[in-house]
């Protein structure tokens, strides 16, 4: 069910599926086998094999990383690495020679570095780097990091395994598989990715919390850890499993060098400021370049010596039956054949004269150690055995075989005490062609590079540990320089989860040293002689150490640890891919939601805009129709009134005619002599009266017409105003509805967005829990394998002890019986029968003693097995507890994030509602203002209405004049 939910979370719709993309630096149309010829295999990384390839045209060598990619999404995981390599042209960064995607395989061709990785060099030489060598590496790494950080690139996987060496003594920073390329200068990342032992504290916190992202300062921390690794072969906390080391990094103080006294003050101060747990106060690469530890480095001679030593011709001798006092390391210098001589005392160590190198590089020599026991300055010899320094000048006899190495008590796997390393600084090579002992079996290694293990992946240095043994104070050298130089010799022990020391080792409580108990050494001694030339000086370095079964166990444990780290890195890569896919899906969901919100709002606005347009259009049409109707009514009314007035006027004319007839009739009734005069007078009076009446009548008709027209116009204007008011009211209601709908949509969108973000947060934490559970399952699987290995080793050791005990008892019994018989014979006490009886009693006692020894061994084995079972159960329970704490922390953080998200949403909703009130108020004020403006406009229109008083207005209705009445 959980897996189904996980698939649902990462599922994209059909139209969201990614199509094949063309990448700028990846060629799809060319078979890389047509351009490059595979000449060998360099190693096997976590994501693919690494081959040594040769360009068929130019003959240039390259390291070819071949990765099978099943989909475009997997291909995209490696594009960032290719783009970074293609855009970063720097002398200390590995160069990209080409990238091809052909037949389902991605070929990444990068610069071939014959020197190999620094961790592989340390494995080859069985020692860490000297301080001058570390200075040069640190200087070049800082310059590379300063360049990367300037391009907004975070490497995120700095370690010695990712620092490659060229034959010229320069480094090449490699493996950008988990690097991040930011788009902004201040951008931060929250991906939990990298190798645990080198992770910065802020990166570790991102496993369960994404609230505190990190920036390029994480590389500075990894740089400091890498310097400690180069000094001590292994990074800090290497004895812990990855689960524990993450907890250690997050909660412990910054790591330091195991033996600070053997390193310079500048080196210790550099590590102190680089390993600052607070990334805000941690310096940048540019600031660290000004530090005295690296600021005066001008030569890479130390690295040229290192590469020459690692690439030197090796002669191997295997000798049997060597005793501790016979083991030696000889470091001899031979002057070149030219006229150039050099004192042998100046060329006595693998560093080839560190004092001269420091002078050449303008770097001050670290303060020399006072003449003190070697235990203070040779704190890192072989983890497989004690280290002795012998030299005629030191006055130490080669027969001093009783030196024991005190071992600091800590939880680690049983240390192999069978290896011995000695440095012999007594002579120059008398003959370059001197052959070793003919009795020894010889094997010569070709002068070829180790597998370029970290051209793409860490193939060698991910699972090495530092011995951390010290010599007792009884050995005091005469020269502090030699004591300081020999401190860099070290071998490796396998990294382990932590268990008790081997039962075959006994602890000397007085000296704190370990010694073998109950058995003798019957191991072979491997003697290696390296010859190389640097700057005209031929150097020979001979190292000897005893080969034991623990060597094979160490190699096996290194391999298993590498496998575990590869498995974790594969999980990290898959987690990163899943997180990237989920982030892309979430971004797409938010983008689609915002587009949908915008479309919904635009659709709602458009709907109301259309409604308003329709309303305004209807209003306009209605007003126009009202105007037209008014015009028609006005004409009709005017016509009707004119007709009525015409009839009234005709009647009025008839009345005037009648009056005229009456006047004539009255005049005719007068005497004839008075008629003429009276007629003339009466007619004049009648004419004046007629004109006056006619004028008054016409004026009254005109006034009546104007009143009727004005009344009609007023009624029409009132109707239009009512219509305008009604339309404005409807428009304002639409505006209110529009704003209310938009406000409702805004609130709904706030709620919907909150629900989506909340669901996305749940999906993100579900994915984190899913990835965390997968990681925990892998860790439990690794722990079970480890416990099983420990149980099997214990069973094998017990079987060997059980099989060896009868032989020892028989031999011991014979010896004791012989000694007892001899004592009886010497004493001569008693007769032969008495002696036989005593011998019989002694034999019975021996049988009882041997039986008791067998019972004691059986009890011891049972106790060991019980303790081992308890230890395995304790390991599992402790791991389970740590995993439960992480899961609980993740769930608690999810709860806090969800609660904070809800609170933020409620606060946003409250702020939105608080802002809504003034928006409503502003809307109502705006609508009321428009109403007032409309009323004011109507009022002004009425006041500005013209009042026609001239007869010209009536002439529209009365085309005749008053003179037409006669």
From Swiss-Prot:
It catalyses: L-seryl-[protein] + ATP = O-phospho-L-seryl-[protein] + ADP + H(+); L-threonyl-[protein] + ATP = O-phospho-L-threonyl-[protein] + ADP + H(+). CDD domains: STKc_STK10. Residues 341-363, 371-392, 438-456, 485-497, 950-966 have a biased composition (Polar residues). Inhibited by the pyrrole-indolinone inhibitor SU11274 (K00593): intercalates between the ATP-binding Lys-65 and alpha-C glutamate (Glu-81), resulting in a partial disordering of the lysine side chain. Also specifically inhibited by erlotinib. Slightly inhibited by gefitinib. ATP binds at residues 42-50, 65. GO terms for molecular function: ATP binding; protein homodimerization activity; protein serine kinase activity; protein serine/threonine kinase activity. It comes from the Eukaryota. Keywords: ATP-binding, Cell cycle, Cell membrane, Coiled coil, Kinase, Membrane, Nucleotide-binding, Phosphoprotein, Serine/threonine-protein kinase, Transferase. Its main location: membrane. The modification Phosphoserine is found at residues 13, 20, 191, 437, 449, 453, 484, 513, 548. InterPro entries: Kinase-like_dom_sf, PKK, Prot_kinase_dom, Protein_kinase_ATP_BS, Ser/Thr_kinase_AS, STE20_Ser/Thr_Kinases, STK10_STKc. The active site is at residue 157. The modification Phosphothreonine is found at residues 185, 950. Its EC number is 2.7.11.1. GO terms for biological process: lymphocyte aggregation; protein autophosphorylation; regulation of lymphocyte migration. It is a peripheral membrane protein. PANTHER family: NON-SPECIFIC SERINE_THREONINE PROTEIN KINASE, PROTEIN KINASE DOMAIN-CONTAINING PROTEIN. Homodimer; homodimerization is required for activation segment autophosphorylation. This is Serine/threonine-protein kinase 10.
